[in-house]
Amino acid sequence: MQINIYSIAKKDAKYQALLEELCMQCKQFGVEIKILNLLPQAVLKAQKISSAKAQQSYTQTFLPYIALPTALNLILHPTGHNYDSQSFAKLIESQHIVQFFIGGAFGFEESFVRLGKSVSLSAMTFNHKIAKLVLCEQIYRALSILHSHPYHK
């Protein structure tokens, strides 16, 4: 299984070690996680203009990545479906490619959200750094469940 996490964000060295540790732990289950932080100039400019322009720029940034027809595309969204750890594990089970999309501060255009399955990590709002950590931990937990590893207990 290949898991790709795309985020509108800069790489942050303070969180990188924790992310790398979680990604490394997933390798024991034959899963490779790639995290791609995207913050092109077009996004930086658009965020200064309006929330609508920012959302459009996020869509344009992510479109080349969501176009993969064989992937399960999961879009993190505050109104997305809430999963417990067991059902999240079932969601990603048997998938060859799973892709997660974490938008910028202004969220996603509805047209982009409809291109995948909307998922919420929590009713609370997290910054991108924390959201990525929580997501990676939940991916590791899901893989632990699927492989009967004691981590989940």
From Swiss-Prot:
Predominant place of localization: cytoplasm
Cellular location(s): Cytoplasm
Keyword tags: Cytoplasm, Methyltransferase, rRNA processing, S-adenosyl-L-methionine, Transferase
Enzyme class (EC, first level): transferase
UniProt binding sites for S-adenosyl-L-methionine: 75, 103, 121-126
One GO cellular component, as annotated: cytoplasm
UniProt EC number: 2.1.1.177
Keyword Electron transport: no
InterPro entries in the cross-refs: Alpha/beta_knot_MTases (IPR029028), RlmH-like (IPR003742), tRNA_m1G_MTases_N (IPR029026)
Highest taxon of source: Bacteria
Reaction catalysis annotation: pseudouridine(1915) in 23S rRNA + S-adenosyl-L-methionine = N(3)-methylpseudouridine(1915) in 23S rRNA + S-adenosyl-L-homocysteine + H(+)
Gene Ontology molecular function, alphabetical: rRNA (pseudouridine-N3-)-methyltransferase activity
Keyword Kinase: no
NCBIfam families recorded: PRK00103.2-1 (NF000987)
HAMAP family in the record: 23SrRNA_methyltr_H
Quaternary state and interactors: Homodimer.
Family assignment from sequence similarity: Belongs to the RNA methyltransferase RlmH family.
Role, per record: Specifically methylates the pseudouridine at position 1915 (m3Psi1915) in 23S rRNA.
Protein's name in the database: Ribosomal RNA large subunit methyltransferase H
Lineage: Bacteria, Pseudomonadati, Campylobacterota, Epsilonproteobacteria, Campylobacterales
